[in-house]
Amino acid sequence: MSNFQAALLLTLLAGLSTGIGSAMALAVRHTNKRFLALSLGFSAGIMLYVSFMEIIPQSQEALSAGLSAKAGAWVSTISFFGGMLFTWAIDQMVPSFENPHEMSMIGPMTDAEKSDTRLHRMGIFTAAAIAIHNFPEGMAVFFSALSNQELGIVIASTIALHNIPEGMAVAVPIYFATKSRKRAFSLSFLSGLAEPLGALVGYTLLRPFLTPFVLGIVLASVSGIMVYISLDELLPSAEEYGEHHLAITGLIAGMAVMALSLLLLT
């Protein structure tokens, strides 16, 4: 399997985890929120640590090969904040009501108080919002895996984990509005396909220019995307699902596991 195929497969698997979240929401009546909080904090810890300790140094090394060390550090830093700005801009495209970063957390599957029409609309717009947000996430997984497959597996796993509650957020309102498990699952599943689509779009646009210098810029931008996702989505969601100390415990554990794995791999 080529690097391209492996990177695309990892991105596809990460995106399709929204379908896992949908299946979980439709199969069980209660979500174990404490475990979810710990898991989301764990994912944030992994993504933050690997961004600062692995991806940014790789970016600076690639950029410094064609520039001076100082110039490479400057370009890497600007690209890092550019990645954050790019993800923030996508966030602003989605109204807060439909934005998965702003919506209320998922509760038990009880009778809905709102009308079926409103619930159905909420589910549709949530699916669209998640699809938009999955574009930069797909690029983050794909380009990380293209640079380093082991790193790509780690990032794909953490993105997949945080896609699970997003799949739940799509499935629950659609199911209550339509009483159709098939429709709820299908919409959630389709929203996840935006992740490999984002990877393909990014690769198609950048492929003619994908030199080591450009890859260094992309890696720094990817780290910015990952840090933004961790701070804007994973940690706030972990705290809302569980409690502050549980989220921080997961965060520290994720960092420790990532640090140990990097030490063992080097």
From Swiss-Prot:
Mediates zinc uptake. May also transport other divalent cations. The keyword Iron applies. Fe(2+) binds at N134, E137, N163, E166, E195. Its main location: membrane. PANTHER family: ZINC TRANSPORTER ZUPT, ZINC/IRON TRANSPORTER. Pfam families: Zip. GO terms for cellular component: plasma membrane. It catalyses: Zn(2+)(in) = Zn(2+)(out). It is a multi-pass membrane protein. Keywords: Cell inner membrane, Cell membrane, Ion transport, Iron, Membrane, Metal-binding, Transmembrane, Transmembrane helix, Transport, Zinc, Zinc transport. Belongs to the ZIP transporter (TC 2.A.5) family. ZupT subfamily. This is Zinc transporter ZupT. The chain crosses the membrane at residues 8-28, 36-56, 71-91, 123-143, 152-172, 185-205, 209-229, 246-266. It is found in: Cell inner membrane. InterPro entries: ZIP, Zn_transptr_ZupT. The keyword Zinc applies. It comes from Chlorobium luteolum (strain DSM 273 / BCRC 81028 / 2530) (Pelodictyon luteolum). One of its GO terms (molecular function) is metal ion binding. Zn(2+) binds at E137, H162, E166. Disulfide bonds: none annotated.
